[in-house]
Amino acid sequence: MRSLWLLVFSFSVLTGTNMAFPMILSERPEVTGSFKVKDTSLTHLTVHRKTGEVFVGAINRVYKLSANLTETRSHQTGPVEDNAKCYPPPSVRACTQKLESTDNVNKLLLVDYAGNRLVACGSIWQGVCQFLRLEDLFKLGEPHHRKEHYLSGAKESDGMAGVVVGDDDGDLKKKKKGGSRLFIGAAIDGKSEYFPTLSSRKLVADEESVNMFSLVYQDEFVSSQIKIPSDTLSQYPAFDIYYVYGFSSRTYIYFLTLQLDTQLTQVDVTGEKFFTSKIVRMCSNDTEFYSYVEFPLGCTKDGVEYRLVQAAYKHRPGKILAQALGLSEDEDVLFVIFSQGQKNRANPPRETVLCLFTLHQINLAMRERIKSCYRGEGKLSLPWLLNKELPCINTPKQIGDDFCGLVLNQPLGGLMVIEGIPLFDDRTDGMASVAAYTYGDHSVVFVGTRSGHLKKIRVNGVPPPSENALLYETVTVVEGSPILRDMVFSPDYQYIYLLSDKQVSRLPVESCSQYSSCKTCLGSGDPHCGWCVLHNKCSRKEACEKWAEPLHFSTELKQCVDITVTPDNMSVTSVSTQLSVKVANVPNLSAGVTCVFEELTESPGEVLAEGQILCMSPSLRDVPSVTQGYGDKRVVKLSLKSKETGLKFITTDFVFYNCSVLQSCSSCVSSPFPCNWCKYRHICTNNVAECSFQEGRVSSAEGCPQILPSSDILVPAGIVRPITLRARNLPQPQSGQKNYECVFNIQGKVQRIPAVRFNSSCIQCQNTSYWYEGNEMGDLPVDFSIVWDGDFPIDKPSSMRALLYKCEAQRDSCGLCLKADSTFECGWCLADKKCLLKQHCPSAEHNWMHQGRRNIRCSHPRITKIRPLTGPKEGGTRVTIEGENLGLQVREITHVRVAGVRCNPAAAEYISAERIVCDMEESLMSSPPGGPVELCIGDCSAEYRTQSTQTYSFVMPSFSRVRPEKGPVSGGTRLTISGRHLDAGSAVTVFLAQEECLFVRRTVREIVCVTPPSASGSGPSSVKLFIDKAEITSDTRYIYTEDPNISTIEPNWSIINGSTSLTVTGTNLLTIQEPKVRAKYGGVETTNICSLVNDSVMTCLAPGIIYTKREAPESGVHPDEFGFILDHVSALLILNGTPFTYYPNPTFEPLGNAGILEVKPGSPIILKGKNLIPPAPGNIRLNYSVTIGETPCLLTVSESQLLCDSPDLTGEQRVMILVGGLEYSPGMLHIYSDSTLTLPAIIGIGAGGGVLLIAIIAVLIAYKRKTRDADRTLKRLQLQMDNLESRVALECKEAFAELQTDIQELTNDMDGVKIPFLEYRTYTMRVMFPGIEEHPVLKELDSPANVEKALRLFSQLLHNKMFLLTFIHTLEAQRSFSMRDRGNVASLLMAALQGRMEYATVVLKQLLADLIEKNLENRNHPKLLLRRTESVAEKMLTNWFTFLLHRFLKECAGEPLFMLYCAIKQQMEKGPIDAITGEARYSLSEDKLIRQQIDYKQLTLMCIPPEGEAGTEIPVKVLNCDTITQVKDKLLDAVYKGIPYSQRPQADDMDLEWRQGRLTRIILQDEDVTTKIESDWKRLNTLAHYQVTDGSLVALVQKQVSAYNIANSFTFTRSLSRYESLLRTSSSPDSLRSRAPMITPDQETGTKLWHLVKNHEHADQREGDRGSKMVSEIYLTRLLATKGTLQKFVDDLFETVFSTAHRGSALPLAIKYMFDFLDEQADKRQITDPDVRHTWKSNCLPLRFWVNVIKNPQFVFDIHKNSITDACLSVVAQTFMDSCSTSEHRLGKDSPSNKLLYAKDIPNYKSWVERYYRDISKMPSISDQDMDAYLVEQSRLHGNEFNTLSALSELYFYINKYKEEILTALDRDGYCRKHKLRHKLEQAINLMSGSS
């Protein structure tokens, strides 16, 4: 079998996860590069295996990125006009379905290395593919005209996979002929008649070849494809096969698929759907698909089945894994990720598992299945194929590994699931993508998750060994954003590229540098990482110097350097000591080491044998302060530094200790360091010389002086008594030392009492009494200590305390006194009726009761409180009785009766002396009376009997109403039950049917409880109460209703802080009492409130989330859970089907410097910030509120700033911004007025003015009348000036705001507009013969035979170069041969020679050479060459470029030109346009700018299109100042968007109806009987004139010719037609101002028409009007705003024209060829001035061709160009010309505005032009042969566009006119005489004249 090279590209990348080691969660920023998008979604990723360049597929885009993810190219693939029901697509055949702007979803992206191109397959036009050049993404082709070109129109981006197979056998001819093959599997979305599910296609070299994507083999019976039978789809409409991953291995092609399990899924469409995973295999050289085998695939872990394949990756195992599997290292394994179960393909469970399959295992299962089938066993068993029930046919056949099937027993399915080996499972993150590679002997698997993380897993074995898969690191890539399937390594395997919805990320495959120690490095489990010993770093071995030398690079934990120091501690008082350092596992240290004690000292180490090093500890002067502030010790790092590397390579702890810090004997002697306690000096020291035995040295805890533990020391307050304590080792005070003292701290007061030491083991505080203030506490814990010699404390147990107590405090009754702790020795003194010590009670023997006495009872019990006070007569009420002296034991309580009814005491609830709890028995009376509580203690004698003052009553509770009356089945409703006596009794239980309602609270009139879930579903339930033993019922019912449901949340996003408004729609919402919305993120739940609007709508404030990382990603984060708390409706707690996104909170920059900004009143304020408009879909935006001081301001919001009008305030005002519950204050505004006069100055001026005024008054009396008039004029002027100033400010501010907001809107409006290119013939005719629609060259020549013969003879002459040159030169020599004639002859010649372009080019070059020669001979400036059309050659050159640049216009330059035209048109129409003068609010031309303030308002009309029905209305934006014709034009533009102008109705053919109900229809016209006439001015009707309102319904209907219409429109049609002819001309004017139509009186009525502005030059313009006019130049700011809005489109056009790359298109050959010709001519004539060459090229191409096209886009597109668009295009064209000029532009304030407008841009454009010319000159020259071949091809394509005979007939006119001159010229030329050209011409003339 011939060798094959197999290139595999899969668009499914896998994911895995496992737990096993000390896993690292990497928080540091791992992503080393990223590429982000906002306006699209990314779908696929591939990396060039040689260059490392990254290619990314997206919706409507393909990007090319550098290896570090910098964008280098992008290619637009959509949107396009399409409809999924159009087959073939509308690009091939007109479709009856409505076309809509459709996104192109990239579904397949792979590199065809053999063809050196990128294959990008999308979803539009039934799934066509584009071939893009790898270098620049230039579109090489997009085959879309055959059925084989349509792969699948399904929209899902992850249902397609492909494998490329290419020939590599060295047979170049065969290779060129055959090319590569593409095996492609695709989900077909139910369209099996259109698309195969799996096929093998040809990839031929020519992208436009008819064979591209054709099936590798096809005859009438068999082909290289498999289709899903239509019967399968009719039975299971949801059936499809989704291709997850494709790859090749040896001679086979494999696909992993996910498909509907037809055996588990019910036929019923609404039933639950089950899916199964399968692996498909075919031979790579099988053209008939006989080898197709399909087997189920799955994995089981811990008894749980995983059947939903998510991603996969083929890999050759590392040595360790291969050995564990028993494989050789060149055999392939497959890592596969599955989700749990078989449901939810679109949103699979997060419980996932990473499994391993060997291809040996898979192939073995398939081979055995094939063998059994060929033995005739079983059936074909492919569930989704019609022949699944066909039996296998017994066919003797040797089945080996290379068997590729026969015509029978195929396609074949397996029934047994091939089970994978589970390696790692994950139950939270949800694994979604996987990739693997081998590093050293290890297999490393990288897994992307749905939570945006990357898991790194080392796979070295399989079960049963425990270390089968080790998760050693998790890296955050894009938090909350799922990692998509495509994960690809860089060619050198240093990086891995990951893809999410909005970002491509590049991460290093390892991050060894994050580990700072050998143990964490080698313990991480990362196989890339080892410890570089002398460099003290974790790295790959390649990054470690001398890694191959012994012990330089460690890879195992046991190889980590070990260090021990002897001794390992020293006192801060010790002198410098030699330390012995022992190190193990170190390389040769012969270069030397130094010993470093942190920042203290560094000294050389002496290296001895066997890893021993001697170091010196720091000297005494370096150490004293080392432990200061560190307590009794400080640990410092002792490090060894290698002199070889200059780095510390091992560090250990060394301790400096300080005994003197320890203040007690026990802490001193228990120290781990050699500290001794000197008890007579009361110090701790390590120096034994400082403390001899005579000084009481103690070295063990047993020898410490200490008080021994005992129980609490009880001290009765006020009683004088000694306190004796047991002790040990109490020292005898020496001479000069003070004796012992007891120190008590009572309520902050210190009490010192002398103590007596009896011996070393006993001490006594002498007789004294102790007291504490107040009786609030019965006992008070007191701090105490024993000290000697002043302040030397004796150690005592920390828990030991003294307790000071008073018997009478808080014990004011006999019962409470006798309850006291018996150790207090308190008793009740009957005489004093107090709780006292025995010695304080007189006649204690008789009067003092205490616990020691038997059978004591307290007399005179008293009841203070009973509860409850009411209860049912049925009993069961638990009554609580509180009081004093209520017995000491429960057995003393007898005879308890409540209102005469027995009540049984509950022993467990009894509190001695204070409380009795008893249970009521039933009253046997029908209406028992109430009464007090009675009880006895012991017996019922008078002194032991009591009765309560409160009375207990029997009541009959009842209820009559519940509210609310209904609630959800799941319960949770707070139910209020209303009635009487509902607070009776001690316990209440509420039942709804048989379920208990959870009690909340109750009062006398109501009970509140929370409803339980209904056990019987919806419907009414009975309500029943149990109060103690009483059962209460009623007829009242509570109704359970269906649980509420949530259908939509708008918007489905908020900001991190939440509190933005959400509108929630659903059902049954009114049954919920307190709805809340909830979110859970990072384990923290947050909620916010909702308000019910009606049963189907509620509004909520979004809950915020706690986001702890620095900043949320721009793409947003998704909460772990999002849902609603609707009572107990648990189904809505988590809404997994509603993805909710949290975007970063907006932030704002401080105002000005230090948060203060100075502004004038009314000035716009810019508040800059970030994240102001979240990148969420839809039109909902954040609601901002800005206040300045207390005053709100009007806002304009953009992505990075708020534009705010400051209010009319002055002084310091704080700015506050409110959004989503957040408040920001970016600072203070200092608003200052223009007044600069101080108060004294004003007073001074006022006083001086007063004196002056008195003098002036006397003078003015004489001139009273004149003064009054002057004063009135002055006031009027002042008023006008104020008015003018405010309007100027308003105008500037409007222009500024427009500039900020228009650009984005305009760009959005441009998206998806289809370009209406003219066909080739119309395009060339408009350039060659502008303004002539029906030219003779387009028609057949109807002429006699002799004329045709004469013209053919004339044609032969024209094809003689010398004749043609003589003919042209002779014509040009004639005075009467006008400029128009020259252009006409040039165009006729090009039309006649269209079929011989190579000959026309030769003639053109000669004519240009002659023109250059003539130019130089006449001593004209060389720069004037080709400047004007003064010769036939110049117009021929224009036509030549017109012919040859047509394809370039269509493929490249046409788009930015059309976008510029559309942008201008739309921007102009956003503001008022004067229908008469053509002037507009938005303009680039000063001459076409409305220089007045026009008040207008935007309206949205709902338009019913012609032949449209109700309900098909289209919203269209118009202005209320638009004339009716202007409105009709805008409506037609909207209705016929994307339709060429010539194919749609015109405004004049339509009437505009305003519909105000069913019957009222008003026809609106520019002029009718309602038209306003003032003086002799008549104003055109506008929408405002008719008072049309926003949202009005209008219709476009065919114009009806009626008497009404004639009467009302005759005058207007006649008077306006002359302006229409001027405004709608297709040619560009020489002078824009001269084009404006003059307003002349109507011939019949004498009135003049106007629309927005009256002509200022007209004689009757009243002078009084000037008062209301603004200085017109102020409106020039609008030019700048318009220019800014259109800048992007102008730049795009210029960049396309002046770029050799042309966004992917090659430079047209014609440009390079002609530029080289001009350079040759300059060289030939020794012209070295570069400016001359530059000018020739500029005059040749930009001036002759591009300027013409820019000014007249209607030459290229089927569009209408109005006068304002024409004026703007002329400004752009002039800028284009200026950019090509070499002369300097000197500009001043008097320069034309269009020159000033682009003054800053022109130098940049000039540099583009210079670079363009320079790049072209550097390109390799085009040979004449190559150019001729290209020209011949052009002639073949377009040779029949014009009628040659008709063109010749038109040219003959000039032969006839200048016959004598031409014949004479032929006579004079030697060549012409020799070849008798005169004779031949005369023959033609005679034949022609014969016809006449």
Curated annotation (Swiss-Prot):
Residues 1262-1315 form a coiled coil. One of its GO terms (molecular function) is semaphorin receptor activity. Disulfide bonds join 86-95, 121-129, 283-404, 299-355, 373-392, 512-529, 518-560, 521-538, 532-544, 595-615. Residues 21-509 form the Sema domain. Keywords: Cell membrane, Coiled coil, Disulfide bond, Glycoprotein, Membrane, Receptor, Repeat, Signal, Transmembrane, Transmembrane helix. One of its GO terms (biological process) is axon extension. Residues 861-955, 957-1041, 1044-1143, 1146-1232 form the IPT/TIG domain. Belongs to the plexin family. Glycans are attached at residues 68, 569, 1183. Coreceptor for class 3 semaphorins. Necessary for signaling by class 3 semaphorins and subsequent remodeling of the cytoskeleton. Plays a role in axon guidance in the developing nervous system. Class 3 semaphorins bind to a complex composed of a neuropilin and a plexin. The plexin modulates the affinity of the complex for specific semaphorins, and its cytoplasmic domain is required for the activation of down-stream signaling events in the cytoplasm. Residues 1262-1892 are cytoplasmic. The keyword Phosphoprotein does not apply. It is a single-pass type I membrane protein. Residues 21-1240 are extracellular. This is Plexin A3. It comes from the Eukaryota. GO terms for cellular component: membrane; plasma membrane; semaphorin receptor complex. It is found in: Cell membrane. The chain crosses the membrane at residues 1241-1261. Residues 1-20 form the signal peptide. The keyword Glycoprotein applies. Its main location: membrane.
